[in-house]
Every structure is written in C-alpha cells, then in structure tokens.
Amino acid sequence: NVGGGLGINYDDPNGQPIPNFKEYFDTYAQHLVLREGQQLHFELGRAVVGQCGALITRTLYVKQGTYKQFAIVDAGMTDLIRPALYQATHKIENISSDEPCEVYDVVGPICESSDVFAKSIEINKCHRGDLIALRSAGAYGEIMASQYNCRQLPKGYVTEDL
C-alpha cells in the first residue's frame, strides 16, 4: 500500500491536465523492489474522475441579509457533503449568467447550519432559476450522497456541454 490517490486542483478544474500515470507508476517501479508474490496496489481516486463531474443545482432564492447576500440552491449537503464534512472547497460558477460578479454565500435548503457550499465568494449575479455548477464533484460527490432529511439521491447525467 503506497497511500492515497493523486489529488486534483479544486480551484482551477480546467487548468489541470490528466496525470501522466505511466510516469507516476515508473517512479515506483524504479524505487520499489517487490519480492516474489508481492503486488503493488494504487488507489487512483480523484485524479481519474474528479474533474469529470459537476453538481448542477438551481437557485431557489436570492436573499439579501443585513451583512451578506445568499444564493440558496436546491442541492444541499446531502448531495455533496465534502464542504460540510471537512470544509472542502469547490469552484462554483453561475452558468446561467454573464452579469457582473457579486459576493454570495452559496447555501443549501437543509435545516442545518453546515449546509453551506461556500462563504463570501464572487460569482456572476444570481437570480431565481439560475443554474449553479459546483465543479470537481466527480470523485466523491454521488457516492457520498445521502437521503438525510427525506431527500432524494442526486441523479447522474452525461454531457459534454459545460
């Protein structure tokens, strides 16, 4: 066991090339001598599929608070728990708007204070109905989803248009 898989760049999903796995494995082959019958196992994880998925959610409401502005979306921590579970960050984009950016807290509809995808981020101005993409959700998004609070599991779709 040589540890966990290769990481990904959550801040710039389009800027990360597909890893050169041959080069990666060759490094181990040069430095590890296996005895007869031994095997080497890798967990490739996020490097293979992390950038292949995005959570697409719809803006339910835009709420102007006293000190901040909220974009409340229909996805919640049940659909992508990484931000709530260990403060993971995902690039978030309003894919319905070309308007100038504004600062939002992007939150889900679940009655939990941890149902937050991001705080104080700049994204294109949000309106009710806008589609919001949480990028880099391909590795552990769907598999870690839950039906907490009677919510349905997210559905997966395949597209090349994002």
PLM segments and residue spans:
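Charged (often Lys/Glu-rich) extended helix/loop segments that serve as interaction or gating elements
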Residues: 38-162
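Glycine-rich tight-turn/loop motif centered on a GG-T
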Residues: 11-21
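Glycine-rich beta-strand-to-loop/alpha-helix junction loops that act as flexible
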Residues: 1-7, 44-46
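Alpha-helix-loop-beta-strand connector modules within alpha/beta enzyme cores
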Residues: 22-35
